[in-house]
Amino acid sequence: MADSRETLTINAFVVGYPIKHSRSPIIHSYWLKKFGIAGSYTAVEVSPDDFPKFIATLKEGKPGAAVGGNATIPHKEAAYRLADHPDALAEELGAANTIWMEEGKLHATNTDGYGFVSNLDERHPGWDKTQRAVVFGAGGASRAVIQSLRDRDVAEIHVVNRTVERARELADRFGPRVFSHPQAALQEVMHGAGLFVNTTSLGMNGTEAPHLDFSHLAANAVVTDIVYVPLKTPILNMAQEQGIATVDGLGMLLHQAKPGFRRWFGRIPEVDETLRSLIIADMEKH
């Protein structure tokens, strides 16, 4: 007998402004097809002014309405604020990227940190044996990274930023194992670190990045970048040229999608090489 989840059309979405760049529909459509689920996952462009109305309509729960979806830039903070039940992860970050209706209430979580560490687990197993990590950048994208590293019990998380005040705010937010430094201290801070994470936009869409010397990192260190366009960012290229292991940022996008799919469609999807190749092919077209 068919699973009852598969006899009804289940609808989910990704909402952002703009949204045409989103590759989330490719990811979820791949999984829907793989499981043979009668469902849809569509990109919806909604301006910040119209977002509260969008959420209010979702909460009405009319027949055929979406069961939930992803919120991306610039709606993550608003998705958290408008949720009836944000979980502890979203609460601490002040942002949600995954929302769903349950018993008439809107629930919210943030899966960015899960995506980040799952990518490292897949592409560089054992990375979390390090006791010292360097997070380069203190913007919004760094929060989930810092949270996930702390929750994986990395002993020291050093946040380096051009304006040290931003880094200090994150150290205050995420606790005593997080330390703040100005960009001038980067080389010194890297000494003995087993993980270097770029959370800045340096190298995004082919822009140049300043030269970084990774020679002070630990012998078995890994450098990763949450930027995935281009796949091999200037920072990853620099690390490879210096003989350092690297992990690109694409897996973070793929893995962060898994909890939402499970929540909306009731199946646990896998990130495989076919899916990865689909996204890379789409990146090469645009």
From Swiss-Prot:
Which EC numbers does the record give? 1.1.1.25
Could you tell me what this protein does? Involved in the biosynthesis of the chorismate, which leads to the biosynthesis of aromatic amino acids. Catalyzes the reversible NADPH linked reduction of 3-dehydroshikimate (DHSA) to yield shikimate (SA).
For this protein, the record's Gene3D superfamilies field holds:
Leucine Dehydrogenase, chain A, domain 1 (3.40.50.10860), NAD(P)-binding Rossmann-like Domain (3.40.50.720)
**Which residues are catalytic?**
76 (proton acceptor)
Mitochondrion keyword on record = no
Note the subunit structure. Homodimer.
Keyword Zinc listed? no
One GO term (biological process): shikimate metabolic process
Q: According to the lineage, what is the superkingdom? A: Bacteria
| Keywords noted in UniProt | Amino-acid biosynthesis, Aromatic amino acid biosynthesis, NADP, Oxidoreductase
Q: State a single Gene Ontology molecular function.
A: NADP binding
In this chain, shikimate is annotated as bound at 22-24, 72, 97, 112, 228
Give the reaction(s) catalysed.
shikimate + NADP(+) = 3-dehydroshikimate + NADPH + H(+)
Top enzyme class of this protein? oxidoreductase
Its annotated pathway reads:
Metabolic intermediate biosynthesis; chorismate biosynthesis; chorismate from D-erythrose 4-phosphate and phosphoenolpyruvate: step 4/7
Q: What is this protein called?
A: Shikimate dehydrogenase (NADP(+))
| Gene name for this UniProt entry | aroE
Any Pfam family the entry gives: Shikimate_DH
What InterPro entries has UniProt attached to this entry?
Aminoacid_DH-like_N_sf, NAD(P)-bd_dom_sf, SDH_C, Shikimate_DH, Shikimate_DH-bd_N, Shikimate_DH_fam, Shikm_DH/Glu-tRNA_Rdtase
Query: Where is it found, in Gene Ontology cellular component terms?
Result: cytosol
Where does the chain bind NADP(+)? 137-141, 161-166, 226, 249
What family does this belong to? Belongs to the shikimate dehydrogenase family.
